[in-house]
Amino acid sequence: MMEKMLVQWREELSEELTCDILPFWMAFLGDGVHFAGRIDGRGKAHPEAGKGAVLIARMLWTFSAAYRMTGRPEYLHAAGKLRKFLALWLIDPVHGGVYWEIAPDGSPVCGKKQSYAIGFAVYGLSEYVRATGDPEALDEAAALFGSLEEHVWDAMRGGYVEALTRNWQPLEDMRLSEKDANTYFSMNTHLHLLEPYANLLRVWREDRVATA
């Protein structure tokens, strides 16, 4: 009885994912450049909204994982758009890391380096590498990892700083959001660095990743 229920739930969840959730986000993505930064609870697109690194990186992970699990080319196409967008618009070409948010025209709205967001970028890129073996995406993930280790890791205190300025200087307000505490370290950020580091190790068997 339980086995039949599990099979049924799996079929229902798979249908929900492939027929509703993923198609919704593929339609939202459009050409992969000129898409709205926000869709509200009523499904209305807001093209004037900025595009956040966390949203893009999470979508990149999602479509990369979906392609890896199903082999469906439309998911690979979506993942490719997202990886390209992340590389061209959200990775800081001057200082490394990723911008927290960019405007619709691509200019940084908030250039601070939030460790949480950089971690998600590593997570999305490493999953894309798992799905495709793309060496450029691996280089991008490795560079972000290097930025975290060079600038964010505080060896004296034994943790990763919550946030820094665009050029990796101390930041007075390090909060992830207005409802979060303004703390130097947080469990939330450390959990969301452990996850991408573990995923990166799957595709980049470097000792410095394993020991980080």
Predicted regions and their residues:
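Glycan-recognition and catalytic cores of secretory/periplasmic carbohydrate-active enzymes
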Residues: 1-212
